[in-house]
């Protein structure tokens, strides 16, 4: 009955046209369905991954978490009811709208709408990105991750770890408190940041080429006010990314090169080097916290903090072996 991955997300917006442009011409997703009040965006072979609808408020609407099959969905529903969680079985009309076979709906302790489903519809039609990109890294890893905020972490984190069985990956305490959780080999599918406010911090979408990130950053630099966090590289999931403000006001992380973790042998631990190896100047932090983050990054650089790149077949070429001194020092190299 374990959750497998983040399968889809729903988003509320006051301006659907802005989301259509942002999702396609900036993020590179494919617009597959649009009406007066809703639109759907595709990232891969799934018929839809991001569902946006018009609303008086901006923000997330729902998070769709995937299970393997009908038996897993029924087992989870029974487990939730036994744990005192009020659930509703999704109607046939809702399942059709979400493009899935079946789903259940419930809320976490701070009011986030969660949908758990199985049997997402797929298509054999080639993915046609809204701008020229290599594609998104999805598959068994899911569509990316969501980082939520909470007024009191102790009010919500146990729900995800003890009832929904999210597994802790790691956590950091400076320059802000953040806790990361995995379902599969993606370093985290969910995280929480302690902000004193319930809501969302960001969603992350991962592309298959570093150049896709750099070219999106060039687009963002033409409107500097949309950049919430500058280009940089995370210490824990090792993603190279930047963050932009979506039309719904929350941040979207656009990244490349996330690490794959060995879930069977993983030990949760504190990350003492801060959230980033370099870059990622966070405009959303208070001035004192922003300066603290910069000081931490300088310390990481001085201590030789670094990590290997995470590549996959088709997006790299191995450089010719022309550095004997590099090979000779391989055992002593610090790679994170």
Name the predicted role of every residue range.
Residues 47-51, 111-114, 187-191, 249-251:
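Short, charged/polar, Gly/Pro-enriched secondary-structure boundary elements
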Residues 1-78, 82-103, 329:
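An N-terminus-focused feature that recognizes amino-terminal "leader" regions
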Residues 19-24, 80, 111, 156, ...:
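Conserved active-site tyrosine of GNAT-family acetyltransferases
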Residues 5-14, 55-151, 179-180, 224-336, ...:
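Vicinal oxygen chelate
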Residues 172-238:
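A compositional/structural signature marking long, glycine- and acidic/polar-rich segments
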């Amino acid at each position: 009955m374990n959750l497998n991955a983040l399968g889809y997300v729903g988003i509320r917006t006051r301006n659907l046209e802005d989301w259509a442009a942002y999702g396609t011409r900036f993020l590179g997703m494919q617009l597959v369905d649009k009406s007066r009040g809703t639109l759907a965006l595709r990232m891969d072979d799934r018929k839809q991954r991001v569902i946006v609808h018009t609303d008086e408020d901006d923000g997330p609407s729902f998070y769709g978490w995937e299970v393997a099959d009908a038996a897993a969905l029924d087992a989870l529903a029974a487990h939730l009811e036994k744990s005192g969680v009020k659930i509703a079985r999704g109607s046939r009309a809702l399942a059709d709208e979400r493009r899935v076979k079946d789903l259940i709906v419930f809320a976490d302790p701070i009011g986030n709408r969660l949908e758990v489903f199985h049997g997402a519809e797929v298509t054999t039609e080639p993915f046609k990105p809204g701008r020229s990109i290599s594609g998104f890294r999805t598959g068994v890893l899911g569509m990316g991750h969501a980082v939520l905020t909470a007024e009191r972490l102790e009010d919500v984190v146990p729900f995800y770890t003890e009832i929904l069985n999210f597994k802790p990956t790691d956590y950091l305490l400076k320059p802000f408190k953040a806790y990361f959780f995995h379902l599969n080999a993606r370093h985290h599918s969910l995280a929480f940041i302690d902000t004193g406010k319930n809501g969302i911090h960001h969603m992350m979408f991962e592309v298959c080429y570093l150049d896709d990130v750099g070219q999106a950053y060039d687009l963002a630099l033409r409107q500097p006010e949309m950049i919430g966090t500058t280009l940089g590289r995370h210490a824990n999931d090792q993603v190279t990314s930047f963050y932009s403000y979506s039309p719904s006001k929350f941040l979207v992380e656009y990244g490349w090169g996330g690490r794959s973790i060995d879930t069977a042998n993983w030990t949760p631990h504190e990350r003492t080097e801060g959230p980033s190896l370099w870059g990622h100047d966070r405009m959303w932090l208070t001035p004192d916290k922003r300066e603290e983050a910069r000081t931490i990054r300088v310390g990481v650089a001085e201590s030789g903090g670094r990590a290997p790149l995470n590549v996959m077949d088709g997006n790299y070429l191995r450089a010719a072996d022309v550095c004997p001194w590099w090979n000779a020092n391989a055992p002593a190299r610090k790679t994170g």
